[in-house]
Each structure stands twice: as structure tokens, then as C-alpha cells.
Amino acid sequence: MINISKLYCDEVTPGDWLRYGKKDSGDPSGQIVPKKASDRRPVVVWNITRACNLKCIHCYNDSGSDKSSNDITTQKAKAVLDDLADFGVPSVLFSGGEPLMRPDLFDLAQYANKSGLRTVISTNGTLITADKAARIKDCGISYVGISLDGIGKINDNFRGVDGAFEKAVQGIKNCIHVGVRVGLRLTLTRRNVQDLEGLFDFFEAQAIERACFYHLVPSGRGSTITSEDLTHSQRRAAIETILAKTRHFKETGKKTDILTVGNHVDGVYLYLKLLKENPARAKKVWKLLT
């Protein structure tokens, strides 16, 4: 995970406290982050189910509506959460599949929070009604990452279900309305790379605080669409757009945390770019990367 906002623009972002902040630090929001790497325990991403209401063509988990038979039981899931709390894990991200397909998700999130674990969910957003958003807030989930892969039909074609984009947008609005932090997760492919400008416009219009751009992972159903992966020139152009837009957000005072995921070379590219633009900053970035 490469934090573009932090590295390229020296921007203070909420990403670190979302991952490493400690609830027992005296700050009720857990926004104090240990400075020593040795004090930062690993964040756990837990695919809590393989059930999903969508049919995303690039799903790394090959999830589907009929794939919940082997899901862990509530009792065993709570035992896992006990172990994570004992280990000192700062945050658990419930993913899937679609975590909101689990009837006990809110029970598990509440249990985790009472055990001292910050809870986050990764969702497609289409199931977040006003009532679900309120329950997300009430059970203590601190952040909701919603997956989108383009605007309108571009997203729906990825997701395999018409209307998925509009439902996800409503889910975003429902979360913001009740005061839950929201970010977006996007997988870059040849189908949506030309839509990057529109996506950044969408971030601004929806007041999105965090956006993660994922490189295509060739596993699950994603292994069947490797031809959709970006070419070298497309990837470079995409990173240049992301860097330019992140700089624009910084210069206009917009607090949006921009990251890329799944290709550590992005960090090297950013460093080499800074080496030409701002050698002093490049030196600091080198230390952060290494």
C-alpha cells in the first residue's frame, strides 16, 4: 500500500490511525499512532464470508450468492476475535465476499469493539440502506470502504448487476448522513482507466475522504481477465493522473487520502519523480519507503 498523499504531498492523513491507532491510548477515537514500528501490530483483513450479492468479474475470492456454506460460525468467529484482541491487533477489517450478507456481522463488530478492536468493513455498498447505516454507526464500525470501479454503467458492467452504481452511491450517502467515515476502493483496468478524471470529480462531489486504487489481482475470477490489466503506458499515465490529482487536492485544501495498492513499484516511480522535482522531499520519501 503506497500512501500517495503522505509521500508525494507530505499530507497528514487518517490512514495510519485507521490501521494502527490505539483505543487504549487515552484518546477515545484511537487517533494516537505508535511512532515505533515495533509497537505497530499487524492489521487483520478477514474475509468473513464468500457470499456476495454481486457478480464482479474481477473478484479475487470468486464469491457468489451460494457460497456461504463453509462460513465460520458466530461462536468460532468470536473466539478468533478474542485471540486477535489478546495479540494486540489494533484493527480488524471485515471483508468477503460481502460482509453485510452475514446476519451476525453487527454482533461480531460490536463484540470486537468491546474487546478493544477497531472495526472496519469492506463492502460493495449496495446493501447499505438508511437502517443499515444507522446500525453500522451504532455497533461501532469506524470506517466503511466501498468498492466502485467506474461511474454508472462502467461500474455495473464490472459488478455484473444493473443498478449497482446507484445503490452504492446511496450507500455512501447513507453512511455520511449518520457520520460514518467513508472511502472508496477501485481496481484499475483497461475498462475504467480512461474514467480516472471522472472518478476524481466524483470524489470531490461526494466529499470522499479516502480512495485506494488497486492494481488488478490475477486470482479468483480475476485470473480469467488478465487481458484487462493495464499496459505499461496505461499504468504510467494512470499513476501520473493520480499524482497530479493528489497534488491538486493538496493545493486546494481538500483532505482526501489517496493510495495505491498491489504494486510497490508505484513507490519507486514516485521517488524517482520527486528526485527531479524536489530532491529534499525525495530524500525523506526514500527513508519512509525503506
List each model region and its residues.
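Radical SAM/AdoMet-radical enzyme domain recognition
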Residues: 74-95, 102-231
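Short, internal active-site loops enriched in acidic
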Residues: 99, 190-192, 263-268
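A C-terminal junction/extension of Radical SAM enzymes
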Residues: 221-290
